[in-house]
């Protein structure tokens, strides 16, 4: 086993094809991190001219000190039962980390706990310090230790059937409501950034400037690894459908009126009246929208990312208006369809805790993500390889105070 010099294209091809590959290990992802002060270097190891493992090393300077942190997000990308590959990757990473004056090498492999016995054993044997099995969204981790993933390698009918019952109904209703899901372009990021601002104000979190999303799109879209989706509500076609629906409901009620007025028929008439009233409300809303925005308005948007057969719901945003049209439900299903059609077998909703209490800040995330036919992907967590013990200890002691300050600020924003 030896170090190899490979092209960025070869690195990305290996990452996309490997079971432990991840979006965060793609070379263009490193480009998106430059705005926040990170820079990257890459390593590869192999034998007989065949790549066995790779890693993208991100470095960030420690404020006011001539040192850096080396962070291998969702790496190494290799078979963790291969001790020699891990040892050779670590040696290569240490060489570069020392050149960059890193005080530690941090990794958080895309290896799940139920398949991670070899990884835990081998990494500890190499001298890595395991950071424990804390909650998925613990502030002690850089990346979530737990994510929710939907298997999408199935038909549309089977995919919807995999969702929880109430969510199935909402998705089917969303598809009937008439919103349009668009695969947008760079220009659409303006709309997306505006929706994100609305979302941040509603949910109490700081939002990114449009340049952040442009950076991601510019870096990853050319290779097909980033797509922007927007959901639009256009009043004219929706009005046509609603008026047709109203006509059918009124016909149904008229037929019921000609029947014997027993309890069963009266209940059906009452149900028809309720549906007619709700449909008329929607028609009134669309008439108003047609007068103010005849071309329609955008209600939600999201960035969908790819790394080989893995797809990721990265950022989502939505308007406060017309939420009864369920634009997010339509968008999620449409993005799953697109991901599947473009070779993905999984759809990652991102970080979560495992069944948090109702009073947890993360309960809402859990309840949203669990209804989409997801399973909990619990990773083995973070590992640190310490290169400068005194500095490492100082920084580890300071981090809890910084974390508390961030939590305090976040709670103030939500008030």
From Swiss-Prot:
Broad enzyme group: transferase
Annotated keywords: Acyltransferase, Cell shape, Cell wall biogenesis/degradation, Cytoplasm, Peptidoglycan synthesis, Transferase
PROSITE patterns: FEMABX
Substrates-to-products reaction catalysed: beta-D-GlcNAc-(1->4)-Mur2Ac(oyl-L-Ala-D-isoglutaminyl-L-Lys-D-Ala-D-Ala)-di-trans,octa-cis-undecaprenyl diphosphate + glycyl-tRNA(Gly) = beta-D-GlcNAc-(1->4)-Mur2Ac(oyl-L-Ala-D-isoglutaminyl-L-Lys-(N(6)-Gly)-D-Ala-D-Ala)-di-trans,octa-cis-undecaprenyl diphosphate + tRNA(Gly) + H(+)
GO annotation (BP), single: cell wall organization
One cellular component term from this protein's GO annotations in UniProt: cytoplasm
GO MF, one example: aminoacyltransferase activity
EC id: 2.3.2.16
Keyword Acyltransferase found: yes
Location (main, coarse): cytoplasm
Localization in the cell: Cytoplasm
Keyword Cell inner membrane attributed: no
Superkingdom classification of source: Bacteria
InterPro entries in UniProt: Acyl_CoA_acyltransferase, FEMABX, PG_Glycine_Bridge_Synth
Role according to the record: Catalyzes the incorporation of amino acid(s) into the interchain peptide bridge of peptidoglycan, using aminoacyl-tRNA as amino acid donor.
Family: Belongs to the FemABX family.
Protein name per the record: Lipid II:glycine glycyltransferase
Organism: Staphylococcus saprophyticus subsp. saprophyticus (strain ATCC 15305 / DSM 20229 / NCIMB 8711 / NCTC 7292 / S-41)
